[in-house]
Swiss-Prot record:
GO terms for molecular function: RNA binding. Present with 1260 molecules/cell in log phase SD medium. Transmembrane segments: none annotated. Promotes the association of the U4/U6.U5 tri-snRNP particle with pre-spliceosomes to form the mature spliceosomal complex. Pfam families: Nop, Prp31_C. This is Pre-mRNA-processing factor 31. Its main location: nucleus. InterPro entries: Nop_C, Nop_dom, Nop_dom_sf, NOSIC, Prp31, Prp31_C. Belongs to the PRP31 family. Residues 344-370 are annotated as: Disordered. It is found in: Nucleus. Residues 225-346 form the Nop domain. The record marks C257 as: Interaction with U4 snRNA.
Length: 494
């Protein structure tokens, strides 16, 4: 028994050794094939070739496009997808190529879209205005051509348009109504045009899928090159914004007022341009959590503030060095936005209605009476001013120059009609608007007048002082004459 057991044990060991050797051979073969493939597959050679091909195709007009030229795109799409699957390639080195190739892919998608419109407009001319999206347009064409649509299969067509083409119910309704009038169902396409349409649909869908794959790849690595933008709006939206602009530096140059419209769908004739929130530019940024988690009433204000902060974050990321993931400013800006959004969404505080204050019993202002009339006389125009404001009919007004060199009209203040209107009558003059003098000032003025009179009398100008009495003049003469001189004078002439 022991010999049989030993024999079976030796067989098991031998079989195990053979299996292990076969596994090792298979692994070595796989490694050699992978090494051969990596040696042949160089992404930094394929990417410039793909960029050059996409650039040349983008310059061709849709009328002159041929399928032999578009057929070269498919192998390049396969190579680009292989590059995206390799994780060992440095993302920083690949990013400049992706920034250059993303706009070219978009232009090629637009080229294929226009090519499809030029081919299919003979059969359904209104379709391009009803379905503006290139991907939905190609899917609708494939549904209409492959499903053999007839009037009895309207339910089946509705199902395919909703699930495969991802159309809304409003779009489907408008499309079915337009098909009854402008869709030429009885005029099928020829074989050549049909094959061109199918191949163009395939290329357009592959380009669209490649664009989405590149966007997802950049979203997975976006925190390396744009940490602040990624922190504010999330990796997916940050990747869409940067991919649309073509790089972080290009995105930082876009003004904040234009960021909201990036990724916005074209307006359709049957759709409303604004929703309840009042926002017209519903692009990539409008779908971020910083806007959607708050009430609809503050969406418009939050979108404007978020665009400003995203623009600042992009400039910060563009100025940082590679590998620097400093998000201090993004944390600060996000906290500010959250605080402002909470303040905007709060209900207004109910202010208590205050009662009117109790009226104070004060004496009312007087508008008449003797004192009030005397008070108003202070501000009344003088009689000369009133005459200056009047003009004599048929005569030229006399004017004088003031200190500033401007002419001032004298009116009737310097005419012979003063006498006629009573200019010199003292009874009509009012002293109400004259300056009021204090007792001290009156005393000082009277003393000054008295001194002036005495000085004039001493000079012999008594004739010009009619108010002085003769007694005062004789008294003043006696004070200022010398009696000795008088006696000498009489004695000398005696």
């Amino acid at each position: 028994m022991s010999s049989e057991e030993d024999y079976f044990d030796e067989l098991e060991y031998d079989l195990a050794d053979e299996v292990n050797e076969e596994k090792e051979d298979i692994q070595t073969k796989k490694l050699t094939t992978v090494n051969c493939q990596t040696e042949k597959f160089n992404p930094f050679e394929i990417l410039p070739e793909s960029i050059e091909l996409f650039r040349t195709l983008a310059l061709i007009s849709p009328d002159r496009l041929s399928l032999s030229e578009t057929a070269q795109i498919l192998p390049k799409i396969v190579d680009l997808k292989r590059i995206l699957q390799q994780q060992e390639i440095d993302f920083i080195k690949l990013l400049p190529f992706f920034n250059e190739i993303i706009p070219l892919i978009k232009s090629n998608i637009k080229l294929m879209h226009n090519f499809l419109i030029s081919l299919y407009s003979r059969r359904f001319p209104e379709l391009s205005s009803l379905i503006p999206s290139p991907l939905q347009y190609s899917k609708v064409i494939s549904i209409l051509e492959n499903e053999n649509y007839s009037k009895n299969e309207s339910d089946e067509l509705f199902f395919h348009l909703e699930n495969k083409a991802k159309l809304t119910r409003e779009q489907i309704l408008v499309l079915t109504m337009s098909m009854k009038t402008s869709f030429k169902n009885k005029e099928p396409l020829d074989i050549k045009t049909r094959t061109q349409i199918l191949e163009a649909n395939s290329i357009l869908e592959n380009l669209w899928k490649l664009q989405e794959d590149i966007g997802q790849y950049i979203a997975s690595k976006i925190s390396i090159i744009a940490p602040n933008v990624c922190f504010l709006v999330g990796p997916e939206i940050a990747a869409q914004l940067i991919a649309h602009a073509g790089g972080v530096l290009e995105f930082s140059r876009i003004p904040s007022c234009n960021i909201a419209s990036i990724g916005k769908n074209k307006h359709l004739s049957h759709e409303l341009h604004t929703l309840e929130s009042g926002v017209r530019q519903e692009g990539y940024l409008f779908a971020s959590d910083m806007i959607q988690k708050f009430p609809v009433s503050v969406h418009k204000q939050m979108l404007r503030m978020l665009c400003a902060k995203v623009s600042l974050a992009a400039r910060v990321d563009a100025g940082q060095k590679n590998g620097d993931r400093n998000t201090v400013l993004a944390h600060k800006w996000k906290a500010e936005l959250s605080k402002k959004a909470r303040k905007l969404s709060e209900a207004p505080s109910i202010s208590e209605t205050k009662a009117l204050p109790i009226p104070e019993d004060q004496p009312k202002k007087k508008r008449a009476g003797r004192k009030f009339r005397k008070y108003k006389e202070k501000f009344r125009l003088s009689h000369v001013r009133q005459l200056q404001n009047r003009m004599e009919f048929g005569k030229q007004e006399q004017t004088v120059l003031d200190s500033y060199g401007e002419e001032v009209g004298l009116g009737m203040s310097n005419t012979s009609l003063q006498q006629a209107v009573g200019a010199t009558s003292g009874s009509r003059r009012s002293a109400g608007n004259q300056a009021k003098l204090t007792k001290v000032m009156k005393h000082r003025i009277s003393e000054a007048n008295q001194q002036a009179d005495e000085f004039l009398i001493s000079l012999g100008h008594n004739t010009e002082q009619p108010n002085l009495s003769p007694e005062m003049v004789q008294m003043h003469k006696k004070q200022h004459t010398n009696p000795e001189e008088e006696t000498n004078w009489f004695s000398g002439h005696g």
